[in-house]
């Protein structure tokens, strides 16, 4: 199964390149929307770009600041700023950030994916798209950029978990060739509301 981007956006690779020790990244962009998907992979030896950000670390700090100040995080499913920061700090993990340059030279974090990559398997630990950017194709664009990068690192199988009631996310994953392989009963704790099952999905990538 080959990686395909079925959404409406055209992708191109930036010609800007710069070095920062061993911490490298690559960058792609949506032409007509001034949106870029930045990849923070501390283990990569590929060329990278950080657009308006000075370095890997300044981009990471900016992402964490935006995450911390966001009121749109799905905390009801157990994710918090602390969870995301610890995941981003783990050197086995890769962060994919979708950033838009708005009028007035203002930058907005539209979505992020944090993935854990070990040998030929990866797990998407956290997938988030801002509420005002959902159902626009941006989620698929971010997801497919992440899958392309994971495939380039030798990943074969990609796993993720999603709440059974999250129909929008379920449709996104199934449209992009993820298939259910199991269920984790009462995985998501929701306080007095009880707990909700998580569906485990897998997608097998091929060269």
Regions found by a protein language model. Give the residues of each.
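Extreme N-terminal basic, low-complexity initiation segments
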Residues: 2-8
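Short amphipathic alpha-helix that is part of the acyltransferase structural core
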Residues: 9-12, 23-27, 35-78
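Acetyl-CoA-dependent GNAT
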Residues: 38-43, 61-134, 140-145, 149-153, ...
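Short amphipathic helical patch at the helix-1/turn junction of helix-turn-helix
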Residues: 129, 163-164
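Short glycine/proline-centered loop/turn elements that form peptide/ligand docking sites
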Residues: 139, 143, 165-169, 186-192
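Conserved GNAT acetyl-CoA-binding A-motif
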Residues: 151-161
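Conserved catalytic-core motifs of GNAT/GCN5-like acyltransferases
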Residues: 159-161, 174, 179-196
